[in-house]
UniProtKB/Swiss-Prot annotation:
This is pre-rRNA 2'-O-ribose RNA methyltransferase. InterPro entries: RNA_methyltr_RlmE (IPR050082), RNA_MeTrfase_FtsJ_dom (IPR002877), rRNA-MeTfrase_E (IPR015507), rRNA_MeTfrase_SPB1-like_C (IPR012920), rRNA_MeTfrase_Spb1_DUF3381 (IPR024576), SAM-dependent_MTases_sf (IPR029063), SPB1-like (IPR028589). Residues 363-381 have a biased composition (Basic residues). It comes from the Eukaryota. Disulfide bonds: none annotated. It comes from Dictyostelium discoideum. It catalyses: a ribonucleotide in rRNA + S-adenosyl-L-methionine = a 2'-O-methylribonucleotide in rRNA + S-adenosyl-L-homocysteine + H(+).
Amino acid sequence: MGQKKKKLAKGRLDKFYYMAKEQGYRSRAAFKLIQLNKKYNFLGTAKACLDLCAAPGGWMQVASKYMPVQSLIVGVDLVPIRQVRNCIGLTEDITTQKCRTEIKKALKTWKVDVCLHDGAPNMGTSWVQDAYQQAELTLHALKLATEFLTTGGWFVTKVFRGSDYNSLIWVFNKLFKKVESTKPPSSRNASAEIFVVCQGFLNPKRIDPKLLDPKFVFKEIQEVKKVDVLSEKKKVNRAGYEDGVTVLYKKGFISDFVNSNEHLQDLANFNAFEFDEAAKIFEQHELTTPEIKELVKDLKVLNKNDFQKIIKWKKAMAAYKEKLDNPDEEETEKPEEKKELTAEEMEENLQEEMKEYLALVEKKKRKEKKRQNELKRKHQRKIELTMHIPGDKIEETTDGDLYSMKGKDEFDEDIVADHSDISSDEFDSDDSDDDDDDDNNGDSKLIDDDEYLEQQLDEQYKLYQQRIRKKAAKLDDVKVKKDKIGQDGYNEDDEEFVEEQEESNPLLVGNKRKEPDAQAVSSLFFDNELFGGVEYRNPGDSESEPEQDGDDDQDDENNKPIDISKLKKQKPQAAQPITKKQKTTNSAEFGKQKSKYQKNPTLDDKDDQDDDDDKGNSIKGFEEVPVQEEVEYESDSDEDIDDKIKTKALGEFLIRKKSRQDLIDDSFNKYAFNDTGLPNWFTDDENRHNKAQTPLTKEMVDEIRRKIKEIDDRPIKKIAEAKARKKYRLGKKMEKTRDKASSIVDNPEMSNREKSKAIEKLYSGTDKKNMKPKKIIMIAKKSKTAGGGTGKYKIVDKRMKKDLRAQKNKLKTVGRSKDSSKKSKPSGGKNKK
């Protein structure tokens, strides 16, 4: 049978434990009260609350959060409670009169609307005693609640399921209108606790003291048996001695006891056994020990174990006697004689054994190979799903290996062997680190064991950062490609086609051409023949270079591929000074692109900056001048809108003195720490997760978002003026058209048909040829072919679009030449009437 698993402490660290840590609650029990309040909503309208057995203060935090502002909250416990905002903590015993006095001082003339109780006694004795102490503590809490609860108040308490549970429910029903038992989801299933919510305190003028007395409430009720007068009396049959027995002490013989099949009855009837002449063979047997001889002398004083020994000895003696009585029937086992094998048979046996052994070895190899392939497949799957980071593995070592520097090289080799599927960049970084370690091998022996472990953690964290940096670089490449597609004139459908083409098969990494980084592009750019005669200047030269103003453009060019053929065709030009207008234009464009691509800085920005500083400030003779920080222009992204909402809400908090002081007080919290010497991986994780909660409600955020939307939807002044002018011109035109139409209607010389045609032509404004709808030209997708159609849209490719544009321009020039020739000819012909 397997051993029973021992319950460990880490098994109790469930999701509510970590949620309490993240949200700043002092215990996971806070979520029990949150879920109870969500179901019954007793904290939303409460103005005063009394929390009994409140340590460490988790329920007080929840009450302060969900109760109205300026509510009175008092917490009582035997253990001192750390200060909770807007709460009063008392260190008293709820069973004493002193506790009642202190609560009255804290409440003054108030009556509480809600009384909470989440206390439990010291557990660890028997379950019956623990359950009784919990029920008794709940009754004391109820007694205290009846003194301070207002009419219609709530009482929420924790109760253990047990024999006293029904008694407590009976008492609750006497004092409250409605009593319900529930178990919130945050309460562990293994726990026997349940929560009783009592609603509508009756507040009677006089409460019977017996209702709150544990001795009376938990007293066991004994049912009184009813006396049956008509019951018949049963006559007891008394058993006497056996007939003809004159002596009560009986002795038996061992020979009869061994031969008897009813030995249990003999042990009950006889007081002792004697060894007679027939039992000499049993007395001399090796199993007949002095203990057996003493046991059979007095059978009435033996216990169960002694009787078992006698019965076991009796069976052994019976088998021994049967063996002596039938000696001829014993079959002697004779070993079989081994046949001598010939040389051929031995050779065949050897061949068969070899085949079996080879088959077994081959089977083990196949099994091991299958296991290795399965492990590799799982490992690769984890890497693809970003569930596992290469190099992020804790090696299991013994205590001797952990605290010694022996075998460090073998340990590093094992790490490299385990992570054979790491990319080439990671191998290069690992090799460089190993070379540095080999150079300083003599100094490494002096390193402390703790420092060695910290170095190992730092190396693992570097691999993790490289992984994040590569993912961020891929996202930047996708953004740059989108911009290139937009500059070439593609529409939104083409952008979606490019994204689908790139994301269709992310595993085919080898087929994609890697984009050149900034250093490779700059080296390729400066190796051109155009810069053959340029003289380089040192940073210390006093003369200023006009090219320094163009560094911003150079940074932008690093993100774009350079066409070498165009550079060769260009002629070298003399350096010209850049005007002030060009400087402002360049800086504005750089600021826009910077706000677009660096709006969300990653954790690796700081590391990239440090790496750039270590590399130096020159590339092949050219000095890299640090770019001044540009102002990031605002964008309409969701993150900027959230920042606006947060800023506006904090500004509203700063208007009033009380809210401003509360905001300043909240800034002094557990998140404000300034410890030095912490590792990078710890500080990065703290900065990402360990943040204080902003005091914003959902209603406040919705209201601010609505105001910002109203401001954004408001048109600018120029657009409003243009719309007004357009509306004014349209009104004037319609008024003029109405006047003309009325004059046509009043004309008596025109027939009704002529009038209708004239009015129709007047309102149409132009003839039907100009009113013919034009076809909208669309560029075909790469997945579609260009072709004609009779619908609203005409699908063309780039070449057809350019041809159509050229054809239209040619027709325009032909029309202009015809018009000029017509104007040169003298007018003639008949005039139309």
